[in-house]
Amino acid sequence: MELQAGARLLLLLGVMCYGHAQIQVHVEPRYASIVDVTNGGTWGDWAWPEMCPDGYFASGFSVKVEPPQGIPGDDTALNGIRLHCTRGNSQKNTHVVESQSGSWGSWSEPLWCPGTSFLVAFCLRVEPFTFPGDNTGVNNVRFRCSDGVELEGPGLNWGDYGEWSNSCPKGVCGLQTKIQKPRGLRDDTALNDIRIFCCAS
């Protein structure tokens, strides 16, 4: 009887250990590091990250922009960023990823790195806090490609660009956005910051 109980215990421990190993393999991150910048806006919360499928990396991007609203409108400027992930060097074989975006504006056409190059770094144009005034958060974004070419989104011009992020040597595989939710009659800023995920391979 004791031998049977011992065998059952060993079997249970084996299953638990195997299951634990399977879980560890399942959640193993597909990215090498997370890269950010220092001048992001202060409002909002970090949304969920979105990743390119396995074997894909970002070689283009598009932005969601609300045009200037005039007086007494409420400007939000950049509301979202999408990564356009490719497999190999074909723009026809693409997958679009988007973390949470703001409610206003429309999406631009994608901007692509030349040839077989891919996105490796970014910087943000952010309007600093103004009081009294209409705050906007992120106004525009630039991405640097692996061949050194810099791409700038068709955003707005309030604020200044900060320093470039660190570079992702093997490319960008995902992003995460910091978004302020709609505030009704109060001042909205929408997109305030982003992070990018560097590919592991």
Swiss-Prot record:
Keyword Disulfide bond assigned: yes
Subcellular location: Secreted
Keywords associated with the record: Disulfide bond, Secreted, Signal
Domain of life: Eukaryota
SS bonds (residue pairs): C52-C85, C113-C145, C168-C198, C173-C199
Pfam families per the UniProt record, alphabetical: VOMI (PF03762)
GO cellular component, one term: extracellular region
InterPro entries per UniProt: VOMI, VOMI_sf
SUPFAM superfamilies associated with the record: Vitelline membrane outer protein-I (VMO-I) (SSF51092)
Signal peptide per UniProt: 1-21
Family indicated by similarity: Belongs to the VMO1 family.
PANTHER family the UniProt entry points to: VITELLINE MEMBRANE OUTER LAYER PROTEIN 1 HOMOLOG (PTHR18841:SF2), VITELLINE MEMBRANE OUTER LAYER PROTEIN I-RELATED (PTHR18841)
Protein's recorded name: Vitelline membrane outer layer protein 1 homolog
Organism field: Mus musculus (Mouse)
Gene field: Vmo1
